[in-house]
Each structure stands twice: as C-alpha cells, then as structure tokens.
Amino acid sequence: NGLGLQNFPELKNDTFLRAAWGEETDYTPVWCMRQAGRYLPEFRETRAAQDFFSTCRSPEACCELTLEPVRRFPLDAAIIFSDILVVPQALAMEVTMVPGKGPSFPEPLREERDLERLRDPAAVASELGYVFQAITLTRQQLAGRVPLIGFAGAPWTLMTYMVEGGSFKTMAQAKRWLYQKPVASHKLLGILTHALVPYLIGQVAAGAQALQLFESHAGHLGSELFSKFALPYIRDVAKRVKAGLQKAGLTRMPMIIFAKDGHFALEELAQAGYEVVGLDWTVAPKKAREPVGKTVTLQGELDPCALYASEEEIGRLVQQMLNDFGPQRYIANLGHGLYPDMDPEHVGAFLDAVHKHSRLLRQN
C-alpha cells in the first residue's frame, strides 16, 4: 500500500511540517481552512460543472480544486479537497448537499436498531478509494511545492450529522442520544472510530504528509459530555492511526486536532496524542499557551471575519497574533474556514503579513 511513496517529488518547502514537529523555522508557516473554497472565482468555475459529492468523487476535480489556492497564494501547505461526510456515505448513509442549505440526510439515525443499516466499518476505506486517488494525484501535481494535508471528521461531529440529519443550531437530537441512549451512542462512536482509522492510514499511504481531525461541533458539549463522548475517541483515533502507520512501515505524520469551541478541553487535547492543537478565535493566544506549554504546536486562530477589514488592519491584527503566540511551536491559520464572500486580495494580504511579520519577529 505504501510502496508508491518513494515516487513522489522531493518536498521543497517543509516549513509547515517542521513547525508541526516543534522544530525551529525561519518564519511562521500559514495555510487556511477552506482555502479551496467559493471565495475563489476559479473554484466556482471548476465546481459549476457538477454537484458537490460528484466533485468529491472525481480525483481530477479534487486535485484541481486543491491546487488552485496554492497556485494563487504563497501558502505553506495544501489540504485535499474533500468533505468529512464521505465517511457516513461510505457507511451506507445517503447524504445530499442542498445548495444554500448544506448537507441533508434523508434517513437519519433515530433508534439504536438503525445502526444495523450501517456498513461494516472495516469496509469503509475500500469505499473511499476516490479520496486516496485524489491525494496521490495531487501529491504528484504539487511537485513538492508544499506538503499535502489529509483530513477527516471526528466521531462526535460525524455522529451529530448522522443523527440530526443535517447541521442544526442546538444539536438537541444528537445530545438526546448521549443522555437517553449512552450505550447506543458509544456503539456508534466506536463504529465511526473503526471506520476512521484505516481511512486516515490510507490517506497517508496515498501520499498525505499530515492529518487533521475536525471536531467541528465540540462547542455543543460541556466538559463532562466532551470528556465522555468526544475525547476518548479523539485519543483513540490518534493512538490507532500511529500504531497502524508503524505497522504498515509508513512514515510517521504530524496529526492536528481542531476542536472548534472546545477551549474548555485545551489541556486534555494537548495530551491526546496530536502534535498540533488547532484553535478558534474565541481563545486568547497567551491563555491557550499556558495549559499546553511548549509540548504541542498551536495552530490558528485569527477570526475569519477579520479578513473583511482593510489590508492595513489585517496586517496589524496578524502582527498582534504573532507577538502573542511567539515565533516557535506555532502555525498561523484562521480560527475557522474562509467564507464564500471573502476577497481573495485580503486572503493574500493575510498570508503575506504572516510571512513578513514572522520574519521580522525572529530578527528582533
């Protein structure tokens, strides 16, 4: 499985990987969540031809969409164009993307017996060959320019979609499961963990050079529910992926955990087996550094809406952020994905400001 690895072009810019491992870098590396997104005119053009999940299933389309922001901007990493919901799809759940509304599951999980409808999690990776093909193709096309990040959704976040049938403000149905059906909840979270581990290992075998786990709905859980229903599975994914990579003779990869609005669990996340902890903009950099120290690299956390500000103001905000995080053990990013109405010029200004100010910071 990992035999194709040596055929990839040599990596020219490894700043992102070095920062992830905690090594010193000449400047602070930067990338953006949803950097391949609708804010780019070329993205809208490429995407116009087919519906969302058909695009996800086309390795050529995913490769092109992944490369577009890298061609345009001085990014230090690429992240494969895909979606976290390909995993529930591979578990035999129907998911459609409704324009203007988001994902929809026509038949969400309502009762414990609905879990019997799910495909064997061991078969999931074989259903997701199109993601692996997209990663291999993209890694070749990147020609070593920057590292390629693979990703997946964390078990709790995937569970919310599968039970709610979409994305809802309160996640009341999913949380009802946690309170009323704790055994079934753990069973479902276990199934998802079993599906995710070979999927993430497969991404590395296909050419991914780092992995990010998105716990996008961490904020719906308080610390007690989080430590019961999210954290154990986040830990388990990291532990099993690392063991699996070693067993398969694959290179170890830095892993990133991004638990949005999960600031109440920062200390636990820093000890969950990931090299990098992603932050959203509600966490002050200095406050985030206190509980985690220099044991992990932090990633984030500019408010994406700051990109609506003037380029001058963006520069000032970036400078402040870099000063607060310090020069080492840090990867710059936004605290969430880019929004469709953002100005690509302002995205460029953000990236340039990170590179410029982080070099100056090191000189002083």
Swiss-Prot record:
Entry's Gene Ontology BP terms: cellular response to arsenic-containing substance; heme A biosynthetic process; heme B biosynthetic process; heme biosynthetic process; heme metabolic process; heme O biosynthetic process; liver development; porphyrin-containing compound biosynthetic process
Top EC class, one word: lyase
Catalysed reactions listed for this entry: uroporphyrinogen III + 4 H(+) = coproporphyrinogen III + 4 CO2; uroporphyrinogen I + 4 H(+) = coproporphyrinogen I + 4 CO2
Annotated Pfam families: URO-D
EC numbers, comma separated: 4.1.1.37
GO molecular function, one term: uroporphyrinogen decarboxylase activity
Residues that coordinate or bind coproporphyrinogen I: 34, 36, 38, 47, 83, 161, 216, 336
Keywords: Cytoplasm, Decarboxylase, Heme biosynthesis, Lyase, Porphyrin biosynthesis
Residues the entry annotates as binding coproporphyrinogen III: 34, 36, 38, 83, 161, 216, 336
GO (cellular component) term, any one: cytosol
Annotated compartments: Cytoplasm, Cytosol
PANTHER family: METHYLTETRAHYDROFOLATE:HOMOCYSTEINE METHYLTRANSFERASE RELATED, UROPORPHYRINOGEN DECARBOXYLASE
UniProt function note: Catalyzes the sequential decarboxylation of the four acetate side chains of uroporphyrinogen to form coproporphyrinogen and participates in the fifth step in the heme biosynthetic pathway. Isomer I or isomer III of uroporphyrinogen may serve as substrate, but only coproporphyrinogen III can ultimately be converted to heme. In vitro also decarboxylates pentacarboxylate porphyrinogen I.
Family membership noted in the UniProt record: Belongs to the uroporphyrinogen decarboxylase family.
Subunit description: Homodimer.
Protein name, entry field: Uroporphyrinogen decarboxylase
Gene: Urod
